[in-house]
From Swiss-Prot:
ATP binds at residues 48-51, 107, 237-239, 303-310, 374-377. It comes from Pichia angusta. One of its GO terms (biological process) is response to unfolded protein. GO terms for molecular function: ATP binding; ATP hydrolysis activity; ATP-dependent protein folding chaperone. One of its GO terms (cellular component) is endoplasmic reticulum lumen. The chaperone activity is regulated by ATP-induced allosteric coupling of the nucleotide-binding (NBD) and substrate-binding (SBD) domains. In the ADP-bound and nucleotide-free (apo) states, the two domains have little interaction. In contrast, in the ATP-bound state the two domains are tightly coupled, which results in drastically accelerated kinetics in both binding and release of polypeptide substrates. J domain-containing co-chaperones stimulate the ATPase activity and are required for efficient substrate recognition. Residues 652-665 have a biased composition (Acidic residues). This is Endoplasmic reticulum chaperone BiP. Pfam families: HSP70.
Amino acid sequence: MLTFNKSVVSCAAIIYALLLVVLPLTTQQFVKAESNENYGTVIGIDLGTTYSCVGVMKAGRVEIIPNDQGNRITPSYVAFTEDERLVGDAAKNQIASNPTNTIFDIKRLIGHRFDDKVIQKEIKHLPYKVKDQDGRPVVEAKVNGELKTFTAEEISAMILGKMKQIAEDYLGKKVTHAVVTVPAYFNDAQRQATKDAGTIAGLEVLRIVNEPTAAAIAYGLDKTDEEKHIIVYDLGGGTFDVSLLTIAGGAFEVLATAGDTHLGGEDFDYRVVRHFIKVFKKKHGIDISDNSKALAKLKREVEKAKRTLSSQMSTRIEIDSFVDGIDFSESLSRAKFEELNMDLFKKTLKPVQQVLDDAKMKPDEIDDVVFVGGSTRIPKVQELIENFFNGKKISKGINPDEAVAFGAAVQGGVLSGEEGVEDIVLIDVNPLTLGIETSGGVMTTLIKRNTPIPTQKSQIFSTAADNQPVVLIQVYEGERAMAKDNNLLGKFELTGIPPAPRGVPQIEVTFTLDSNGILKVSATDKGTGKSNSITITNDKGRLSKEEIEKKIEEAEKFAQQDKELREKVESRNALENYAHSLKNQANDENGFGAKLEEDDKETLLDAINEALEFLEDNFDTATKDEFDEQKEKLSKVAYPITSKLYDAPPTSDEEDEDDWDHDEL
């Protein structure tokens, strides 16, 4: 156990004061030093609970990149079917038929221990299985007929990999560096796990940026004149953050932040789902609480209804053959939706008040309130915030779904040396107080919450007993007075302390918090110079270096499988299109078919039917090469017959095939 050495308080206080004075300057130098590296194109990714978004800065402008469906936001869903992995829209669209193998809300699991209360509460609502593996939650899904487990980092990596692919398809080149956003209230372990997910996805995550800070950049990029105090109210699908910032001349300084990493649109949906479970049971005597397929259908329709209620006063939820052949048909009014969720809506006001108190400001000193996240479209949420700020109208100049990715892309532009953003400076803060346990179980603070980062703080401690050879450094985050009531981040020992009376040895403990909010702690015996340190890794919740390397290999294997499947489907489609095109032509009695000799026509149709039968019998099981062989076989029959009809026949099989081989629209 450690004790606090009071004799060095004044010295430490002076050092701390000096640190704060020089911090804005050192932060600016840090950002600009990073931007001198040659990273190539750096994309910005908003890795959301329910939806993700990717942007890039090109020629001084930010572009939000649409996915292959033309959508600018992509569902944070991963699904495993019998023969493929789906990510994004395709995964979400099939959840009703495949609920136990469709993974979503993974952001609510990442960086947690399995026995965390929030995780135990969360997994009760999920249709897929969450298991305990070495103290951390892993999800279980059936892949190619076998049960396989995935860490939250792996699933997040699949989503990040999808966003990476979207950017690469758009840019036409490989992307290896990114800025990724996280909720401001994410703790150290959650930030580390998010960086690990990026590594597994083949991305070097240059910066972890807090979501409200990124949104503030989107809001304030073109507002470089007078100083403004703004509040960013970020209510997304699964997390909630509030940050109070000062914006002036390209500098974005966070003064205070607060939030709840388990509050968002998914919670509002679940309240409505729970309501309709009771209604259906009362009407039909059937409890669907454990029916994953019925729940997936209901959840999907409830989410649609919630969106509708943002612009209408009521809507109707209709689901054919909901369960046991019974149709579901119920109305939902905006008033009922608000009644079911009012306590959750009001719960968001507490962090708003907290950031004002921490920054020592009043509501009327705030120049603008910026809404971010899809859940801020809920009319009652808007009304509550406007009333809180005495009728102040909410700023609606930025897209709440895209603002975070926009800001991340700007930060990516800063790091890659894009023109027009040279003067942008981010000064963010740590969301929670950091300290160590000292004698009596007390939490002794080294870095207070809302301290600007990056930062470093040192303090001298001593031994609690005579001749104590070892001190245990236990690192905590949280606001409670006793260490046991806070969150243990990690611990390590400093050994080999020479025998001495209690209180004599001087142990210097140093906390270093980097610009990503990731903590390193060191302890040095000033008498012997002996030291030890750790980068906080939350041993029970974080992947080891070896595990990360293994996950990278598995991710590459999945990517290869995806590539092989895509090539197989392309070959299958090419054969199918070619066969059907030939068949239609051969049967056209007013055109091509009328010119064929009867024997040739019969030979051609036999070959076509053989190819179509092969497709029908081997649609899922044949390989790419087998589909290609069938197409070549059909081509060898078709070519001599079709070439008779032309004065100038094609010079090769390949040219002939091109006449018939077209992608379907």
